[in-house]
Every structure is written in C-alpha cells, then in structure tokens.
Amino acid sequence: MNFQFSELVSQIIKGLKSYFEKNQIEVNEHFYEELMNILNIELSKPFNKQTFTPTQILNDYIKNELKEDLKITPHELGSELNNSLILWGIEKAKYFDDKSI
C-alpha cells in the first residue's frame, strides 16, 4: 500500500481542532490522542480489512465521546483533508481493482 495514512490522520486531527475551535467545542488533548490511535489502528489495516471510512470513524468517536451527533463532513475539515480522502479512496479502489485481476 503506497498511501500514507499517517498524513490523512494528521489532517483529520488538524481539521477537527480547527472545526471545534470555530464552533466553540472544548475537548482535552486526550480526546485527540485517542481518536488518532483509533484512526491509526483502522487505517493501518489492509484495505480489505478496513470496515469504516475515516469520516465514519470520526463521527462515531464524536458521538460516543461527546454524546453529540454532529455528522461532520470532510468539507468542514478543510480542502487538504478533502484531497487526502480522495487519494485514499483512489488507493482503496486500486487495491480492489488489482485484487479482481
């Protein structure tokens, strides 16, 4: 797998911090560390073993930890993240395309 998921995780955290700041939602640093850990675990798996998208992981975590159903979209977290998610999707599609040959 060529895709660098660590960059994607970093952009998710950066975008979420900005989103929370803009919307005056306060969390401690442990919140971000735990989310980063969950994202790293899921996204380090081979594509065929990943059961959730990064956005699903993010929103599920927020719902469970903050008891808020915010349904944050990648667009709300910045264009860099949007681009990285597109690349992640392309890499995932390539993975499955290669497996079908």
Functional labels for PLM-detected ranges:
Residues 4, 8, 30-35, 50-54, ...:
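Residue-level detector of well-ordered alpha-helical segments, enriched
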Residues 1-32:
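Short terminal alpha-helical segments
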